[in-house]
UniProtKB/Swiss-Prot annotation:
GO terms for cellular component: extracellular region. The modification Tryptophan amide is found at residue 33. It is found in: Secreted. The keyword Nucleotide-binding does not apply. It comes from Callinectes sapidus (Blue crab). Residues 49-59, 67-78 have a biased composition (Low complexity). Belongs to the AKH/HRTH/RPCH family. Its main location: secreted. This is Red pigment-concentrating prohormone. The modification Pyrrolidone carboxylic acid is found at residue 26.
Amino acid sequence: MVRRSGVTLLVVALLVVTLMSSVSAQLNFSPGWGKRAAGASGSNGGVGEAVSGLHPSVGGAPGGVVPPGSSSPGDSCGPIPVSAVMHIYRLIRSEAVRLVQCQDEEYLG
């Protein structure tokens, strides 16, 4: 009985290794996709307005964070308002606190 389960385990392991070696995936990220989508149509559910609301100072007004330059044309975002960066930071921090609280409740409960 032990020998049979060992053989079964070996066959399953070989099957998994074979399947994993034949699978491949590629993930591509283009930082300009959002700008193209926002400018593509006028009636896009407010996406264009939301994007333009995040970048009120394209000309380089004070109070913005300027991202590093890009080597490909059309990827120049302009300055990013500090308030937008701080809002994202607060969201991430609050979610991290919530996750820690959930983990504490799980271990203590």
